[in-house]
Amino acid sequence: MKKILALTILISSTYTFAKPNNGAEQDIRSYSLLHGVSTAEANKALVLEANRDSALDTIEKEFKGRIGGIYVENAPTYKIVVRVKGYGQNEKRNVAVGNAISKSNLPIEIQYGAKETRENAKGQLNKAAKLASKYFSKVQTVGYDEKSGSIYVRVKGKQTTENQRKIDQIKAEWNNPNLPLEINLVNWSVKPLVDANGGTFVAGQISSTMYADCTTGFGIKNANGTKYMSTAAHCPNNFKSKQDGTPYTFVGEIPFAQSNDLQWNSTTANITNKFYVGPTTTRTLTGRRTLSATRVGDSVCHYGNATGYSCGTVRGVGVIVPEYDPNTGAPLFPGSFWVDVNTSTCGGSDSGGPVFTALTIASGILSLGAIDDVTGACQGYYYVPTDKIYENGFSFIY
């Protein structure tokens, strides 16, 4: 366990629309409200979102070394936009995706004229973070905007004459017209969100007088088939279910300092492929989405101790969170794997909970929140992608 401010943990999974008990109506309604589209359009979009990966793998190969960005437009209809460096004839494609039961046409729009590739731009994120940190002490997030082709830096601070002068100095020093640098002043800070079905609400003692709340994530297993329940490493080591008192015993963790936030616990409960999306409602995990398959504009949902079930939109993939320990100077949340989700619904004790897409596809484990220091309002959250589970020898229980 690591920090008192961390978010609760949940369990996520993939989806199968053919099974009515897998929550299609719940996600369709959420998508419709989130993007302002009809329920019919929402249903169509979720089907496309669940079946698009192979089509986009083909796009990645076709334009290898030239892609400036790939993102999702959710309204008025679902489509994929691919920005390509260099010259060419813009085009619109419809690619059949789906399964043996049903297929749909995935709209893909190819736009030429990008000035820089995504790979080269992401290779400049640390440079941008270091430059901004020369002028500001509270840089929160640095990422690449795949829609605009610019690098964005979000800094905790107010709009003042002095801060504007610093922003102008940073941009002058950056001076790269092919890769613009945008500095945004924000009123929030990035913090861990702490306050055997996945999504179980749990609490564990962290001192003689204090307990921390979290949420469990997904059922996982190692190469030998031994099953564990996952959560965030910054959550308590040992904890109990707040519902029935089931104990979860610490086995191991890979903390922030090792560019992760993964913990696994054993329990007397039967660990399955189920995860909660409501007080008594579960879904069945059917697959996972990797970091490379995650797109800006994706709709993702989470379930947590503090806020229950809610959905948001991915606004950054592979972002960095350049916060440093004021005493040692060590990075608090190292790594360039974080996925940034735009939502107003998150809170302490959501840490460790499941983040999922297309009903039952696991996206990752919820870890950090962008929290207003005055009001406590959520301005978004960051999750650890499924890659960080699999690269350490674990896999989901399907």
What are these regions (language model features)?
Residues V37, E41-K44, Y112-S133, S137-Y144, ...:
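Protease-domain processing segments flanking chymotrypsin-fold serine proteases, especially trypsin-like
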Residues G65, A75-K79, N105, S148, ...:
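Extracytoplasmic
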Residues M1-A18:
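Gram-negative bacterial Sec-dependent N-terminal signal peptides
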Residues V81, E109, P180-N184, T313:
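Ser/Thr- (and often Asn-) enriched beta-sheet segments in non-cytosolic proteins
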Residues V186-Y398:
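Terminal interaction modules at protein C-ends
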